[in-house]
Amino acid sequence: MSIIKGTGMVADRLSVAVIQTSLNADAAWQSLAQTGDWRESIRMSSTEERRAKGEIRQFLSSIKNTGKTPDIILLPELAVPLGFERQLVRMAESMESIVIAGLDYQLDGDPAAKRVSNESIVIVPRRLKGRTIASQTATRRVGKTYPAPAEEEKLRRTGVTFSKRPTVWIFESSEL
């Protein structure tokens, strides 16, 4: 992949780190029969949430300790518990790397409607690779439009409807 650097030159490489936590999906998102409450079934369990946060911190620390910070850090969909966004922003700023992370489900509107949505967060720190590119760190949310078939089936069995978020963002940078 070639990208334009701030110098106008084409870079030969884009460094990307992918962090995959070891969440157990069945433990993280328990069935309605296990929880008795659909809201609990669509939220990551507290045990798996603690594990996910710990693993994310550990992986990011390990990456930082290599001395070779990536241009972009990816965390797949549903990998990041809700409420962990501020820590991700601080980590992106500390590492001077863009972070694209998939967040856990969130309730969509009136709880009586039993609707959930899913988003990712894109964090662009004000500094990339030692170079200031903006006056402050920017965050954007990108909505998910279609759930995977197995995901949609599990939500259906829980009595929950998936709210589509047909969002398209185009990111352009002369600094990468």
Task: Please provide the spans of the model-predicted regions.
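Active-site catalytic loop in hydrolytic enzyme cores
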Residues: M1-I4, A113-L176
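Cys-nucleophile CN-hydrolase/nitrilase-fold catalytic domain and related Cys-dependent amidase chemistry
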Residues: T47-V142
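Active-site beta-loop-alpha junctions enriched in small/polar residues
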Residues: T21, D104-Q106, T145-P147
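Hydrophobic alpha-helical segments
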Residues: W29, Q34, E85, R90-M91, ...
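N-terminal, active-site-proximal structural segment of metallo-dependent hydrolase catalytic domains
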Residues: M1-I72, L78-A79
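Short, low-complexity, polar/charged sequence segments that are solvent-exposed and flexible
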Residues: T35-E40, A92-M95, G159-F162
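A generic secondary-structure signal marking the coil-to-beta-strand transition
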Residues: D12-A17, E96, A138, L176
